[in-house]
């Protein structure tokens, strides 16, 4: 039979195959390989189609969900627009009627929820005097029968305020002392850390204030030689309410007394610029001590007869007491000490300043925060 090999013990004999048989065998191999590739391509295509069948439904679900949410939102907006909003404001009468209806509904709801008894007061249109009388009646204060009150609580608050100011001056002086060289002789103002700090703070304030004045060319640098901020506190008592003179408000009168040893000593030089610049200088050392300051303080809150912002006005009765002393030394070579006329002129000038600024009928005006005033208003 052709195409078979016969194995024997002897030598191997081969038979030659015809060429047509070889060609048919090669074509069979090629057709098998092509079928194998086609089968593999069919398997790959099937897996890809299955993957897309999983992706496409997920995208369709998200799109449908978003479309549903958009429809619900548009439906909600349409219902809200139809029930709660209007396209045109309507006539003025209709607007006022709607406003009254809303206000009445809110007021009725508030009255039903709250249990506060109704209060009544005198309308402001009846005048300030009627309002003041109504004010006194509501706070149950009769000026003609009410006894003067003690102000122990106010004494505590003022004492705490004064203590805070003293401590702030001490802290400011300590901060300034870190940057300044204390190469000065031992002065009463440097006896302890508290006085040293107060000296530095006060010197800085006084010398900065002198820079913008015309006297800076005639006065040398100011040196604080002695300072004592005191250790006691003022006391207030016998507060009573009185009607104001212009009958537009009430005022409060408070007696006060402050007994301490407030001391301030300053050393400087006064320059003479004639006939030439800095022709000569006159050394001057002044020390003032306030031992007692007492009187009656008047506090009034309200508006003046003319239209002005709301403010507090403070003044002193003319019978105030100011016990102070001044010691002076003038000159470098020959010295003039404690000239009585200088002390008299200085204390008279101090009392005159008080009388023209804080003694009745002059007031110290303290602007209070206003309503409806612009921020640029200096009194606001």
Curated annotation (Swiss-Prot):
Keywords: Endoplasmic reticulum, Lipid transport, Lipid-binding, Membrane, Transmembrane, Transmembrane helix, Transport. Residues 86-380 are cytoplasmic. The keyword Cell cycle does not apply. Pfam families: MMM1. Residues 147-369 form the SMP-LTD domain. The chain crosses the membrane at residues 65-85. The keyword Plastid does not apply. It is found in: Endoplasmic reticulum membrane. Residues 1-64 are lumenal. Its main location: endoplasmic reticulum. PANTHER family: SMP-LTD DOMAIN-CONTAINING PROTEIN (PTHR13466:SF0), TEX2 PROTEIN-RELATED (PTHR13466). Homodimer. Component of the ER-mitochondria encounter structure (ERMES) or MDM complex, composed of MMM1, MDM10, MDM12 and MDM34. A MMM1 homodimer associates with one molecule of MDM12 on each side in a pairwise head-to-tail manner, and the SMP-LTD domains of MMM1 and MDM12 generate a continuous hydrophobic tunnel for phospholipid trafficking. Belongs to the MMM1 family. Component of the ERMES/MDM complex, which serves as a molecular tether to connect the endoplasmic reticulum (ER) and mitochondria. Components of this complex are involved in the control of mitochondrial shape and protein biogenesis, and function in nonvesicular lipid trafficking between the ER and mitochondria. The MDM12-MMM1 subcomplex functions in the major beta-barrel assembly pathway that is responsible for biogenesis of all outer membrane beta-barrel proteins, and acts in a late step after the SAM complex. The SMP-LTD domain is a barrel-like domain that can bind various types of glycerophospholipids in its interior and mediate their transfer between two adjacent bilayers. This is Maintenance of mitochondrial morphology protein 1.
